[in-house]
């Protein structure tokens, strides 16, 4: 009703299910077309790495009730608290992002709060460059 069309959420915000319910109401009750919406979410630090990232994506999609995502972001660069080797965990997470993008499940992939050396490592290690670096 208010006209919002851009929704930025994250696994860590714990509101994906609520947003999904709002999107469902907008589409079904108000006639808003899914194509008119831009929805982004982010994978949390504890769900990093290839397999965990794919599972986290599926869970986010289930909560959001969507068939595709407009933008998927790695929420934070890996830090020692969560992972010993930041470059390797970013690389394996990014491989999962590239797969989701190639499969058409995500229209754009990127990162959030990454410093220049983190982005540089992804461009060196991956096939697809990050399309967005969302800075807090």
Question: What residues fall within each predicted segment?
Answer:
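N-terminal binding-site loop/beta-alpha segment at the start of enzyme catalytic domains
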Residues: 1-37, 67
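Conserved, mostly hydrophobic/aromatic
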Residues: 7, 19, 39, 60, ...
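Short helix-capping segments at alpha-helix termini
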Residues: 25-35, 64-66, 101-105, 125-129
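Beta/alpha (TIM)-barrel catalytic core signal, keyed to glycine-rich beta->alpha loops juxtaposed to Asp/Glu
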Residues: 76-136
């Amino acid at each position: 009703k208010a006209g919002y069309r851009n929704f930025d959420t994250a696994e860590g915000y714990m509101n994906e299910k609520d947003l999904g319910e709002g999107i469902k109401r907008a589409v079904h009750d108000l006639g808003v077309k899914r194509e008119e919406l831009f929805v982004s979410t982010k994978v949390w630090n504890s769900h990093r790495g290839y397999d965990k990232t794919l599972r986290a994506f599926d869970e986010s999609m289930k909560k959001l009730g969507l068939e595709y995502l407009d933008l998927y972001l790695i929420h934070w660069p890996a830090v020692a608290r969560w992972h010993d080797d930041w470059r390797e965990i970013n690389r394996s997470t990014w491989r999962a992002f590239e797969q989701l993008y190639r499969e058409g499940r995500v229209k754009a992939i990127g990162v959030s709060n990454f410093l220049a050396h983190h982005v540089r490592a992804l461009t060196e290690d991956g096939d697809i460059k990050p399309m967005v670096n969302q800075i807090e």
